[in-house]
Amino acid sequence: MANKNIEIEIQVNVENSKPLIEFLEKNGNFQSEKHQVDEYFSLAHRDFLATRPVAEWLRLRDAEGKYSFNYKNWHFDKNGKSHYCDEFETKLENIEPVKKIFSALNFKPLVVVDKLRKIWTYKDFEVAIDSVKSLGDFVEIEYIGKDEKVNPEKVTGEMVDFLKKVGCGKITRNYVGYPFLMLFPNELKYEVQ
């Protein structure tokens, strides 16, 4: 998206990812396949997990030796559904000094999300097929278009429509993300689309 500090995305389980993969192989542009290890932290003076839904996530990522530092603040509608977040991210030359800084500042480690991610682009979407250790397979779609004035709820609806048109069968959406799924499996509320 043109405003690089806003992220519009959905994360879903699909009944059948094969039609999606076949569609992307024919019509999309394959970008990469990466092993990503994401470590999530909370601040010593402010517990991100104290609120529901959890809105803030602080992450360090190791993507096969390419490192990044990321903060997300999700915005939820009155029904607790997220359609976009404020996102700030930067590359890191070396992740270990940052981990030492976090430790010195008493940041609390929360969870590690270990996944294999295959990424394609198709029109205004980046489509990722994720195999997440201990959670299973997911599809994540992010808006990468240039229009800054798009309606996030409309765009996420178009993402679901895209998956339906491709023929993925039942689409089960969560609004909380992988770290929440791992930390609080008994609090999950899925929505069939």
What are these regions (language model features)?
Residues 1-124, 168-173, 177-193:
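N-terminal strand-loop-strand beta-hairpin
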Residues 15, 146-148:
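Short coil/turn motifs at secondary-structure junctions
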Residues 68-70, 128, 140:
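General beta-strand recognition
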